[in-house]
Amino acid sequence: MAKIELTNMVMVQNPETNEVLVQRRVKYWCGITFPGGHVEDGESFYDSAVREVKEETGLDVKNLKHCGCVHWHNTETNDKYIVLFYKTTEYSGELLKSTDEGEVFFTSIKNIKDMPLSPNFDKYLDVFLSDKYTEIFCNWNEKMKENCDGEPDWNFEYR
């Protein structure tokens, strides 16, 4: 039976500096990304996003706006991995320097593009930073490899 895995990712932006909060992940999905994680059983998508930001950054966020998603579909198993995207400029609390997930800090959007990013995070940024798209869809499976340019063999469809 096909599985569905639900996760979230949150762009927290400082309204005064326009810098965004990033995480330099060191365990899984290594590289620069926005904070986020799994939706737990019995938890709303929104509440899971608030909880994950708190756990990974120490910040309390509110008034999150849903801004899109990425839908990964495994063509061999029919499993689905869905990441719900949120963003906010409203937060409080003391920022942690790091957690077991990695270092967290504010930086400019321009600087992010020059940092070593988590896999496919550059594609996700297109949805977070533009009102042009609300979804990325991708068919993939474990047999697909990177091509000679180091790019994945699968296609990202923006909607």
List the model feature ranges, each with a label.
Residues 1-20, 35-38:
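Conserved N-terminal beta-strand and adjoining loop/helix that marks the start
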Residues 3-5, 15, 27, 78-80, ...:
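A generic fold-level signal
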Residues 17-18, 28-29, 72, 88-94, ...:
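Short, charged/polar surface micro-motifs in flexible loops or helix N-caps
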Residues 22-33, 41:
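N-terminal first-folded block
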Residues 29-32, 105, 144:
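A short local loop/turn or secondary-structure capping micro-motif enriched for an aromatic residue
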Residues 39-62, 72-124, 151-159:
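Unchanged
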Residues 129-159:
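Charged phosphate-binding loop/patch that engages nucleotide di/tri-phosphates or the phosphate backbone
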